[in-house]
């Protein structure tokens, strides 16, 4: 999980339904701040991403079995509902990275692999950092990135190093700007406070923060975001920007050698940050 990386608040909103092309995309609130993502095709077939809790998924699907389940990493708030879903629909394929801590997987995926699931096509991207085996799924104009990238933030490093995590984020940032980013937690408001501490003079960030406050006040999700928006606002994707580097160096108290060092300083700063 994100382990408290952002403001935690009970999610009260109804599931979000948006459209990407001809496909409805739905986020189901779970626990305090998780999102489980559903993608439906025009035949009503559904892809389920990171079902940490089976209950909202069972309620959303009714009697229709999922076409497949995609898992990004092994944390319980992402895989905890898989067993109950398989008990209901035992033939459901479960795609997951190579990691013994995901025993429910029926199909292991590797970096660069291209998946054809129904009419959908996704590429598997290895993005170590939050965990060593974390993957993301990119395709259909969408990015299911688990706990690697959040809106205005990123996941904590439980098993990776700053160079690994920074490289993973840079890899995601290089995808097309109109890619819709489907993060697994509603952390945006808390992340915004830190982002503004790092880069208070960023006008795109000010605009995004105002939008986020309106959405959360209305009980609405702040996701999906886009990669273009994150590149303009998210300090963890802006380690080469002079203002972000300067803020990190001021916090560290010394010059930083490269983007990975800037990232590591930002992540450590965020870990101990109090508004």
Language model features with spans:
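Divalent metal-coordination and catalytic microenvironments
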Residues: 39, 50, 73, 109, ...
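Conserved beta-strand hairpin/beta-sheet module of binuclear metal-dependent hydrolase folds
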Residues: 15-64, 120, 135-152
């Amino acid at each position: 999980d994100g382990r408290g990386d952002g403001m935690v608040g009970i999610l009260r909103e109804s599931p979000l339904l948006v459209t990407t092309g001809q496909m409805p995309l739905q986020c189901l609130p779970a626990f305090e701040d998780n999102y489980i993502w559903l993608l439906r095709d025009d035949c009503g077939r559904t892809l389920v991403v990171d079902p940490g809790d089976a209950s909202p998924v069972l309620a959303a699907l009714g009697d229709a079995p999922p076409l497949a389940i995609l898992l990004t990493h092994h944390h319980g708030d992402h895989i905890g509902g898989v067993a109950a879903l398989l008990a209901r629909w035992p033939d459901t394929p479960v795609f997951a990275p190579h990691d013994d801590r995901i025993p429910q997987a029926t199909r292991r995926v590797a970096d660069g692999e291209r998946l054809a699931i129904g009419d959908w096509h996704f590429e598997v991207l290895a993005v170590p950092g939050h965990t060593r085996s974390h993957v993301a799924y990119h395709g259909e104009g969408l990015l299911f990135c688990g706990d690697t990238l959040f809106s205005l933030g990123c996941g904590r490093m439980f098993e990776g190093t700053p160079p690994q995590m920074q490289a993973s984020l840079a890899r995601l940032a290089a995808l097309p700007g109109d890619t819709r980013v489907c993060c697994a937690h509603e952390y945006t408001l808390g992340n915004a406070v830190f982002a503004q501490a790092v880069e208070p003079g960023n006008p795109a960030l000010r605009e995004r923060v105002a939008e986020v406050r309106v959405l959360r006040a209305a009980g609405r999700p702040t996701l999906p975001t886009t990669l273009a928006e994150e590149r303009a606002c998210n300090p963890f994707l802006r380690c080469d920007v002079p203002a972000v580097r300067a803020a990190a160096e001021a916090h560290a108290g010394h010059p930083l050698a490269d983007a990975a060092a800037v990232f590591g300083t930002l992540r450590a700063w965020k870990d101990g940050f109090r508004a």
